[in-house]
Amino acid sequence: MKNLKVARRYAKALLLIGKEDGQAEVYREELEAFSSLFKANPDLEAAISNPIYEAKGRQALLRSVVEKSGVSAVTASYLLLLFDKGRIGFLDVITSEYKEMADELKGIARASVSAATELSNETIEKIRSGLGRLTGKEVVLTVSQDPALIGGIVTKIGDLVLDGSIRTQLLNLKETLKRSEAV
């Protein structure tokens, strides 16, 4: 919980700079690229963030990677600041928070839809426009297939979950029957 608060603070700080200089989207792309680099090379992340190794050596390694990656001066300074403050290990969470805040700034909501069967483009568009009306934002949908739902769909947007699946209806019916037997 504390790490999430810290991540939000650092993400918000970079986003404010991005709003000010109009480079918020550039910083987003650079953070995502650097975060992906760490995910693809866990040994690199460990070498940079593990306090067992000498700080000067880790910082030199980070500087070298930052210079070779060609990120903007602001992102480079930001990554070095994260290192200096001992927060470079939170880069993935910070990047995630930054993306959420940047989407909010642009009026974009991200949603996911799981369906038991493949959805037609027309159905996906109806869901997207319905969620757009509900939220008042442009909705970016991620669609997946989950046969375990039996039928219907489950939609998640932010903290809101709209579950219209047959599986959930059957589970609810089962619980209702159990309660009526207990009486």
Curated annotation (Swiss-Prot):
Q: What is the recorded membrane topology of this protein?
A: Peripheral membrane protein
GO MF terms, alphabetically ordered:
proton-transporting ATP synthase activity, rotational mechanism
Q: Keywords in alphabetical order, please.
A: ATP synthesis, Cell inner membrane, Cell membrane, CF(1), Hydrogen ion transport, Ion transport, Membrane, Transport
Q: Which InterPro entries did the record assign?
A: ATP_synth_OSCP/delta_N_sf (IPR026015), ATPase_OSCP/dsu (IPR000711)
Tell me if tRNA processing is a UniProt keyword of this record: no
Coiled-coil regions listed: none
List where in the cell it is found. Cell inner membrane
The superkingdom listed in its UniProt entry is Bacteria
Coarse class of the primary localization is membrane
Record's GO cellular component, any one?
plasma membrane
Listed PANTHER family: ATP SYNTHASE DELTA CHAIN
Role played:
F(1)F(0) ATP synthase produces ATP from ADP in the presence of a proton or sodium gradient. F-type ATPases consist of two structural domains, F(1) containing the extramembraneous catalytic core and F(0) containing the membrane proton channel, linked together by a central stalk and a peripheral stalk. During catalysis, ATP synthesis in the catalytic domain of F(1) is coupled via a rotary mechanism of the central stalk subunits to proton translocation.
Q: Name the NCBIfam families on file.
A: ATP_synt_delta
What do we know about how this protein assembles, alone or with others? F-type ATPases have 2 components, F(1) - the catalytic core - and F(0) - the membrane proton channel. F(1) has five subunits: alpha(3), beta(3), gamma(1), delta(1), epsilon(1). F(0) has three main subunits: a(1), b(2) and c(10-14). The alpha and beta chains form an alternating ring which encloses part of the gamma chain. F(1) is attached to F(0) by a central stalk formed by the gamma and epsilon chains, while a peripheral stalk is formed by the delta and b chains.
Instruction: Report the sequence similarity comment from the record.
Output: Belongs to the ATPase delta chain family.
Q: What is the official name of this protein in its record? A: ATP synthase subunit delta
